[in-house]
């Protein structure tokens, strides 16, 4: 992901992404550069300009994963809370989950 982000930064800066430019961005960010990963990135994008890569990426993001809102999915209705009595304090005691969905973008 870091290599792709570096590629995007070079492309968005108005330049044509090159291996040396991507490596320079990675080094500036303190990321150890693996030349084989840079080569694999450019092999994947061979023959495509930056705009084409962005357009293809956006089309793949359209069908993203959705999940119900945790507050509406787990919150009991007023009638259910009144009838269950003891269940309401147990539900209130639950801890909230971290909503980062495990992406760890900058780990």
UniProtKB/Swiss-Prot annotation:
Keywords, sorted A to Z: Phosphoprotein, Ribonucleoprotein, Ribosomal protein
GO molecular function: structural constituent of ribosome
Free-text description of this protein's post-translational modifications in UniProt: Phosphorylated.
Disordered, as annotated region: 85-107
GO process terms (BP): cytoplasmic translational elongation
Entries under Pfam families matching the protein: Ribosomal_60s (PF00428)
Stored Gene3D superfamilies: 1.10.10.1410
GO cellular component assignments: cytosolic large ribosomal subunit
Function: Plays an important role in the elongation step of protein synthesis.
Family of this protein: Belongs to the eukaryotic ribosomal protein P1/P2 family.
Subunit details: P1 and P2 exist as dimers at the large ribosomal subunit.
Protein name: Large ribosomal subunit protein P2-A
Organism: Trypanosoma cruzi
């Amino acid at each position: 992901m870091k290599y792709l982000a570096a590629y995007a930064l070079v492309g968005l800066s108005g330049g044509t992404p090159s291996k040396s430019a991507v490596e320079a961005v990675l080094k500036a960010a303190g990321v150890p550069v693996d030349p084989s990963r840079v080569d694999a990135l450019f092999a994947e994008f061979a023959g495509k300009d930056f705009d084409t890569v962005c357009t293809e990426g956006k089309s793949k993001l359209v069908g993203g994963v959705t999940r119900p809102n945790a507050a509406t999915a787990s919150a009991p209705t007023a009638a259910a809370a009144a009838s269950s009595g003891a269940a309401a304090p147990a539900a209130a005691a639950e801890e909230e989950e971290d909503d980062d969905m495990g992406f760890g973008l900058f780990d």
